[in-house]
Amino acid sequence: VCTRVVYLGTNDRNVTGRSMDWKSEIGTNLWALPRGVNRTGQAGANSAEWTSAYGSVIATGYDISTTDGVNEAGLAVNLLWLAESQYPAETADGPAVSLALWGQYVLDNFATVAEAVQALTATPLRVATAEVPGEGRMATLHLAMSDASGDSAIVEYIDGQQVIHHGRQYQVMTNSPTFDQQLAITEYWKQIGGTVMLPGTNRAADRFVRASFYIDAVPKTDDPLLAAATVFSVVRNASVPYGIATSEEPNISSTRWRTVVDHKALRYFFESALSPNTFWVELRQIDFSPGAPTLRLKLGEGEKTIYAGDASSGFERADPFPFLGVP
């Protein structure tokens, strides 16, 4: 359910792209969240407490969680499904954070991947999950980070323990199996060579292999237009046609939307499967100062609302959405 890639261009033109694959309407809107906001982890006893040090533009899931976004320092997060995720027990140590706030915690507190990894390694979070709205099953996600330097990290919770893969080489993430197994599968396909044959199904392991080959094979540039277009083309290649879903395999679902982050330009692109246009947000045009209003760009049912080009001025004041807490 989703594919994420990082393009390492020339002259630090580093660009992250992802698809959001989900079998039903996910109720996404874009939000601009300022600095200086006090938050808690909303996960019961010992919940983390912090004040946002960085403003961010995010895409929500159901308007109760941060599923994707980038902060004003150029740090991006992408949350993707991972069925194998097992989060710490309620009795485990560490500051507690609801899964809905996990990505926002990173965007609020850190400027770089290295900074986030250092903090999360020193003090692992006790991430707590809840049911997906209307699904009757627990949400299970892993988190990817990337920054303006091209650095990346993948954070997973396996058997209740935090596992972090940190390095520029971790440019691709999809879904099952766990990241270490994805890397092993990709090594096998490297021996065959992508120009000879690539696996073509919608399964997560196949999307991982295709995305890994193409994000490495495409030409590298510092041209912001070409870089963004290139990343969109790779993400589209790993997308799932609209209307395709496999009920017994939630890892295979229709692509609902795609995002691309130009870390150098601080530009956040959004493309809905049900809208004819790609549009973008210029983070440098948004007031993230403490006390600035929370802003929302309404995408409508099925993200069908049509925007084109720079949609930064389309954001409107709104009451902050409530993150889904875990009792």
Language model features with spans:
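A contiguous strand-loop segment
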Residues: V1-G94, A122, V127, E131, ...
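Proteins synthesized as precursors that undergo proteolytic processing into mature forms
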Residues: A96-A130, P224-V234
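C-terminus-biased signal that marks the final domain/tail of proteins
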Residues: V1-V15, A128-T140, A148-G150, Y170-P327
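Beta-strand residues in well-ordered beta-sheet regions across diverse protein folds
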Residues: G17, L79, V155-E156, F269-E271
